[in-house]
Curated annotation (Swiss-Prot):
<dbReference type="Pfam" id="PF06083">
    <property type="entry name" value="IL17"/>
</dbReference>
<dbReference type="GO" id="GO:0042803">
    <property type="term" value="F:protein homodimerization activity"/>
</dbReference>
<keyword id="KW-1015">Disulfide bond</keyword>
<protein>
    <recommendedName>
        <fullName>Interleukin-17A</fullName>
    </recommendedName>
</protein>
<dbReference type="GO" id="GO:0050829">
    <property type="term" value="P:defense response to Gram-negative bacterium"/>
</dbReference>
<dbReference type="GO" id="GO:0005615">
    <property type="term" value="C:extracellular space"/>
</dbReference>
<dbReference type="GO" id="GO:0032755">
    <property type="term" value="P:positive regulation of interleukin-6 production"/>
</dbReference>
<dbReference type="GO" id="GO:0002225">
    <property type="term" value="P:positive regulation of antimicrobial peptide production"/>
</dbReference>
<dbReference type="GO" id="GO:0050830">
    <property type="term" value="P:defense response to Gram-positive bacterium"/>
</dbReference>
<dbReference type="GO" id="GO:2000340">
    <property type="term" value="P:positive regulation of chemokine (C-X-C motif) ligand 1 production"/>
</dbReference>
<dbReference type="GO" id="GO:0007219">
    <property type="term" value="P:Notch signaling pathway"/>
</dbReference>
<dbReference type="GO" id="GO:0045944">
    <property type="term" value="P:positive regulation of transcription by RNA polymerase II"/>
</dbReference>
<feature type="disulfide bond">
    <location>
        <begin position="97"/>
        <end position="147"/>
    </location>
</feature>
<dbReference type="GO" id="GO:0071347">
    <property type="term" value="P:cellular response to interleukin-1"/>
</dbReference>
<keyword id="KW-0395">Inflammatory response</keyword>
<dbReference type="GO" id="GO:0097530">
    <property type="term" value="P:granulocyte migration"/>
</dbReference>
<dbReference type="InterPro" id="IPR010345">
    <property type="entry name" value="IL-17_fam"/>
</dbReference>
Amino acid sequence: MSPGRASSVSLMLLLLLSLAATVKAAAIIPQSSACPNTEAKDFLQNVKVNLKVFNSLGAKVSSRRPSDYLNRSTSPWTLHRNEDPDRYPSVIWEAQCRHQRCVNAEGKLDHHMNSVLIQQEILVLKREPESCPFTFRVEKMLVGVGCTCVASIVRQAA
């Protein structure tokens, strides 16, 4: 048997094995009475969801990676992994400001400026309820996407 043929046979066996494991795993998951009946004729078997986000700015967008900014900013941040297997997307990277203050050109903290988290609301798909493996709901989620500098609020004693 040729190497190409052997690898395609191996791939086919691997796919069959994973399908068998999936079917076996699906049979074990207990179904709540609140779950929709997936065997019913009127149950929608396939749903196509377009999750692509189109860039309305086209070629005007900089090709510079966002990771360049998190270190060069006067309000630097770190990215933290937020993982939830019952959510799509299951992994979301969230920003957290490194300091309460901003960093000046010399790399020292500027006590006249505050570092503030920039947040963006996104939509995610959440599995609902946990006992219904094929049911999802749309949920809003507030995600930190970066940090910026703002002037400190100075209150004068009267």
